[in-house]
């Protein structure tokens, strides 16, 4: 377990390990989890960074909101670590039939460009790594 620095800034709480410089401005993005329990958000963000799942995470500084787990888009092993963590901790919602929702990885460039809702299209999705029916890695 690595030491984690916690920083509150602009409505967000960041969790950092001092390795953020490896994140490339145009390749960096995040897998997201929407929460309604701030204590849980604190726990999963801190744990993910401390255990090397990702080098940076953040959550909204509110009782509900979003957690973001950061990595570079071309870091295939990093995607697998984060998604494995999501699956192990039941962070991906399921449909009524038990199938995992096909969540998306969002580049920070897309966020900076204001791509939200129907304007947002991801090239990296859960289905590229995991069978949505079984939750097993491909």
Located regions from the model:
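Structured alpha/beta or helical-core interaction and ligand-binding surfaces enriched in interleaved
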Residues: 1-138
């Amino acid at each position: 377990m690595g030491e984690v620095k916690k920083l509150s800034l602009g409505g967000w709480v960041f969790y950092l390990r001092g390795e953020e410089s490896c994140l490339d401005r145009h390749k960096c993005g995040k897998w997201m989890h929407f929460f309604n329990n701030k204590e849980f958000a604190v726990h999963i963000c801190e744990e993910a960074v401390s255990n090397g799942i990702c080098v940076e995470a953040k959550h909204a500084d509110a009782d509900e909101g979003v957690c973001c787990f950061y990595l570079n888009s071309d870091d295939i092993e990093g995607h697998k670590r984060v998604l494995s963590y999501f699956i192990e901790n039941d962070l991906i919602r399921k449909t009524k039939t038990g199938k995992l929702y096909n969540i998306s990885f969002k580049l920070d460039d897309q966020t900076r460009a204001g791509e939200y809702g129907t304007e947002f299209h991801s090239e990296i999705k859960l289905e590229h790594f995991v069978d949505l029916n079984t939750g097993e890695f491909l």
